[in-house]
Amino acid sequence: FDFIPTSDVISFKYVFGSEEYLEFVSSFNDVFGFFLSGPNPAGGNYVEENLAIIPGTINTPVSIFNVNNVSNSAYYIDNGDGFTAPQNTDPTVIQFDGFTTPLTATANVNCGDTYHIKIVVADAVDWVWDSGIFLEAGSFYSPTLAVSDNLGLDSSIMNITCNTQITLTANGGGLAANYQWFDSSLNLI
């Protein structure tokens, strides 16, 4: 799908699940990816850059081989066979024998440019045991810029989309007044 971000970052939450867990972790390696294409703010272009990577790694993809009860186990939930212990007792039980904890895919983007994301599930070698991805509803996020005037009793916050021109006018203070603008992280703009 194509999208146009409203800020300089995008993110969304997902869970990867598979019936390959745990019996086939070493035999078959079902994997998936969220592949981003479009302008890279650091220069050049993203060309099918995988956003589905294990947190804290540079480019290790989320797969049954890389996330399980031994590897990156902090991100793994054992669901047994889906019917017997230690299955997840949550009322939203699924048949997958294991799945990841909710993970977040994120990327730096150029506000206002067009991007493309391709979602791919690779059911490696066998077709008997399924794997799937669950996207959290409403989690695809590209925040708008918030500008706040907190200098007086009449404070306001303006949500500004990218490529929007605004004029800020400061009144008072006389000729000796010195104004500085900071972003939400208190960096001087």
Task: Enumerate the language-model features and the residues they cover.
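Short, solvent-exposed loop/linker segments at the N-terminal edge
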Residues: C111, S155-T164
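Exoplasmic/lumenal beta-rich domain surfaces
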Residues: V25-C111
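Structural beta-strand segments of beta-rich domains
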Residues: D8-I10, T164-L168
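Extended extracellular/luminal ectodomain segments enriched in beta-structured repeat modules
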Residues: F3-S11, G112-T114
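Proline-enriched interdomain boundary motifs that mark the N-terminal boundary
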Residues: P143-S156
